[in-house]
């Protein structure tokens, strides 16, 4: 399940579109179905067909962002595309109808949203957990970039944010693990298990200009055993800085 922001921009380059298509095709060829909704990064401000629709039309993945529940292998899945905060009040009835439509369904019920929940991030919050339909057994969430899972007494299942699968420019460079959730629904409860991805390491270092050579040595030691070349950010402070000296030191990292 892709909970929105399949791409980082509404108009990704051709390589990204093909790579994603090939990956979804591989899933399909191995009898693994996938589902997706749209996040704000998938939706252009200019009215045009979102790129991910290509995968739905080709049969590689199924679009479920229209709020209509579908039954799949004994599971009920429903999703909604990104809702702007200013439009949230219009969706109260939609949430209520979703709740009623799945209430008597005996199997697991999954709701896919691309929203910020205030209890997870008060600055990015667009709705409270109490605003959500209460009868779903798993809430697959997109939008927030950090991993987090919470269970609330008023909901029948956990709210799970796997976060982004790669650091983005808005997050800056930091040492953080990325991954996704594999959810066990063999029992009455949905149990998310964290699967860590082998992403490219990213490090940020602060140094005084006079200590740059020493800092570069420390960086070389830190990254010497990595299998993937990392992304390195070096913040340098000082006076009478010579750019040639900086370039010579940074070149040691190549």
Predicted regions: what they are:
Residues 2, 113, 141, 234-236:
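Conserved beta-strand positions
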Residues 7-15, 209-211, 226:
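Short, glycine-rich nucleotide/cofactor-binding loops
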Residues 7, 84, 118, 239-244:
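Short acidic, S/G/P-rich loop/turn micro-motifs used as interaction or catalytic elements
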Residues 185-254:
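Accessory, non-catalytic peripheral segments of nucleic-acid enzymes
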Residues 10-177, 181-184:
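His/Asp/Glu-rich metal-coordinating catalytic cores
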Residues 1, 27-31, 107, 215-217, ...:
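Intrinsic structural disorder
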Residues 1-8, 39, 234:
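Active-site beta-strand/loop signature of hydrolases that rely on acidic residues for catalysis
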